[in-house]
Amino acid sequence: MATSQTSQTVAAHVPFADLCSTLERIQKSKERAEKIRHFKEFLDSWRKFHDALHKNKKDVTDSFYPAMRLILPQLERERMAYGIKETMLAKLYIELLNLPREGKDALKLLNYRTPSGARTDAGDFAVIAYFVLKPRCLQKGSLTIQQVNELLDLVASNNSGKRKDLVKKSLLQLITQSSALEQKWLIRMIIKDLKLGVSQQTILNIFHNDAVELHNVTTDLEKVCRQLHDPAVGLSDISITLFSAFKPMLAAVADVERVEKDMKQQSFYIETKLDGERMQMHKDGSVYQYFSRNGYNYTDQFGASPQEGTLTPFIHDAFRTDVQVCILDGEMMAYNPTTQTFMQKGVKFDIKRMVEDSDLQTCYCVFDVLMVNNKKLGRETLRKRYDILNSTFTPIQGRIEIVQKKLAQTKNEVVDALNEAIDKREEGIMIKHPLSIYKPDKRGEGWLKIKPEYVSGLMDELDLLIVGGYWGKGSRGGMMSHFLCAVAEKPPHGEKPSVFHTLCRVGSGYTMKELYDLGLKLAKYWKPFHKKSPPSSILCGTEKPEVYIEPCNSVIVQIKAAEIVPSDMYKTGTTLRFPRIEKIRDDKEWHECMTLGDLEELRGKASGKLATKHLHVGDDDEPREKRRKPVSKMKKTIGIIEHLKAPNLSNISKVSNVFEDVEFCVMSGLDGYPKSDLENRIAEFGGYIVQNPGPDTYCVIAGCENIRVKNIISSDQHDVVKPEWLLECFKTKTCVPWQPRFMIHMCPSTKQHFAREYDCYGDSYFVDTDLDQLKEVFLGIKKAGEHQTPEEMAPVIADLEYRYSWDHSPLCMFRHCTVYLDLYAVINDSSSKIKATRLDVTALELRFHGAKVVSHLSEGVSHVIIGENQSRVSDFKVFRRTLKKKFKILQERWVTDSVDKGELQEENQYLL
């Protein structure tokens, strides 16, 4: 019977190979529109097959979910964790395929992040595995999408039950019945990173216009696929529901200087920013559920009823007797009843895994309420939600508490609160607008956060030595993306340190250019790290690098972090929380890094917290936004790493002297004319090839603007020319003069030359122009004048207003608004215009103050304004469901009040 029901699903009939070939096409497509087309074709064929399979049956639960959970595995919540990462998969493949341990293919799998040969797939385990598996696998697999999901369910459940032999058995079934291409995508599904080049929001939007919004309030992919199966049918009400996890509202990083402006010059709440785990609690009588910010269910830990868990038994009686149903949002904290203090997350404990007999106890700190007795409160203001929250339960110290807040109005009060948080060793502060409504998965809609590390000058920074490295993945493949940093043992007086203790691993804070430059500087010094024979100068904990560098060849980096916390992963017995590189200390020698004594002194200074200074506000000491410290540049000769060495051109026969003694740097070619072919032809014409442009380089040839080309352009030292110019030279066997159509970038001297030879549209002053060139010039003129209509000039005007601080003028308060007014008896029917209505004057007011007023309601409209007659509000709400970007429906008073007061008013109080 079960088999019969299973076969009545689309997933039971669709080969897994079809999904994989679709994913392969999506990934290989360069244009976003092409990627979307491939996904839509697969989705449409699924829906057609679904209609044919189920005909007109009602209450069909079959949906696109079996495919969607494989396409967006990072959103999977039903299936438990696989407990498998790349290294474990590599070992499993070696064992299951019986590969020799020291063989070439086994080492490829184990060292997948290490660059080798000419391939550019370093760091992409799935691609490495594909080439290892290709000669050993079926040409085409036999599994359906349904069968793949069933086997992955077994992998997850057996991993949860710690039955490794059964995990291997399920994986073996997948391997023996799949092609190499299918396994490439299986690996990505297991690792939960498909690298498709399109976001999950794009995928959900293609599936259904309401999919993103529904997922934000449910985090349930199966529910999204089932309820929104028909793209023509929308949901009338998408809101937070009981026992359905939603994505919580988030806070944006605040600039202390802008707080008053961000809060609309009105009073605001200041709360302590808690350092725990964001958690939502759903309660219905004696039934409880707890969900994390990512939608994971932690009910087993905290308690599904008053008889079980680390929290529910202690808080059940705290709720008022008339409160049966509620949804709360807050932070799960660890409370020490002995010291009556909350523990910081950096200390060695996990609130989600604390046992009942622990010295610490679970405490739920609540700061918001979203439902009480089936009354949904998300659309209520924060002020009203706070009032309701205070009457929902009676706080119990150390078990369930309400986060305290205070009302403030100035940035001085914000600074005082931040300094107080620093003194108390707290994470920071939250700032919330009393009129803000709750918006799932939105950041900064009236909620702000300030942490000491966001403000320059408040943190102690550490000068650490790089002693190890880790190969990167994805866009950082083939280069070091993370570094192992250390402090020195204090040497005898007058000597340099010889032993270093590891402290932390850091992989953020730098741009791709800074990472690339640092990689070039250290490239020739990296050595493989062998765990059995580690270098005597570098002492590690359990965390070992993939490669190491002799300290005397390394550089010091300045690290900023939140605090120093205990850790047995590093030799110092401590590590840094949230470390990031601020700058490379080119002004310091390798032996001038921090010592163990310096580290211990810093750790004892403020119980490990690195924020020890106060923020001051005054005429000469304004609080400043966080800025990247300028990296001091040091003149250096850039070396050439192995895979950038020039090609062997010794066998090339010269056919012309057109490029005699001319030096070129070819970055990339074109379709049909790859980089190597262009280099060979240049050599045939007598030219020289270099891989990095220098002072003697005539020009850089680039078929596309990758990161290296962009860096060359930003240096403004070399001309960057399209390969088409080279092809023209090869064709005519002459050095064709440069023309504007060949140029990607011009250095200052070339710009001056072109200014003398050509007008601003690329038309030569001295050389006759042919028909094709004239067409090209006319196209340029068209582009230059494209911002001519008032609508098209609006963003240009807005930019000018912002640049010269005119955006504070009341005359441009509606500049970013596109407004449709309720002037028509039938929406979008201009022939049904209502005569002699006050909204005509309102439309003029809007235009006068910068708004774009439209007569057609469509995608891109930001506001709909309703007059005294509100009979069409429900029609507008129905229409809004058909749009991807939702407009706000406001009373006319929002416009008139804003104009009267000379500034935009808070929209929430005018919503309909």
UniProtKB/Swiss-Prot annotation:
PROSITE patterns cross-referenced by the UniProt entry: BRCT (PS50172), DNA_LIGASE_A1 (PS00697), DNA_LIGASE_A2 (PS00333), DNA_LIGASE_A3 (PS50160)
UniProt keyword Metal-binding present: yes
Cofactor(s) the record lists: Mg(2+)
Residue ranges constituting the BRCT domain according to the UniProt record: 654-743, 846-912
Catalyzed reactions: ATP + (deoxyribonucleotide)n-3'-hydroxyl + 5'-phospho-(deoxyribonucleotide)m = (deoxyribonucleotide)n+m + AMP + diphosphate
One Pfam family hit: DNA_ligase_IV
Keywords carried by this UniProt record: ATP-binding, Cell cycle, Cell division, DNA damage, DNA recombination, DNA repair, Ligase, Magnesium, Metal-binding, Nucleotide-binding, Nucleus, Repeat
Any one cellular-component term (Gene Ontology): condensed chromosome
Gene3D superfamilies named in the record: 6.10.250.520, BRCT domain, DNA ligase, ATP-dependent, N-terminal domain, DNA ligase/mRNA capping enzyme, Nucleic acid-binding proteins
Gene Ontology biological process terms in this record: base-excision repair; cell division; cellular response to ionizing radiation; central nervous system development; chromosome organization; DN2 thymocyte differentiation; DNA biosynthetic process; double-strand break repair via classical nonhomologous end joining
Region (Required for catalytic activity): 610-620
Main location, first listed in the record: nucleus
List of residues binding Mg(2+) 2: E427
GO molecular function, a single term: DNA binding
Coiled coil: none
Enzyme class, broadest EC rank: ligase
Binding-site residues, Mg(2+) 1: E331
Binding site for ATP: E271, T272, K273, L274, R278, E331, K345, F367, E427, K432, K449, K451
Catalytic residues as annotated in Swiss-Prot or TrEMBL: K273
Localization in the cell: Nucleus
NCBIfam families named among the record's database cross-references: dnl1
Function: DNA ligase involved in DNA non-homologous end joining (NHEJ); required for double-strand break (DSB) repair and V(D)J recombination. Catalyzes the NHEJ ligation step of the broken DNA during DSB repair by resealing the DNA breaks after the gap filling is completed. Joins single-strand breaks in a double-stranded polydeoxynucleotide in an ATP-dependent reaction. LIG4 is mechanistically flexible: it can ligate nicks as well as compatible DNA overhangs alone, while in the presence of XRCC4, it can ligate ends with 2-nucleotides (nt) microhomology and 1-nt gaps.
Listed name of the protein: DNA ligase 4
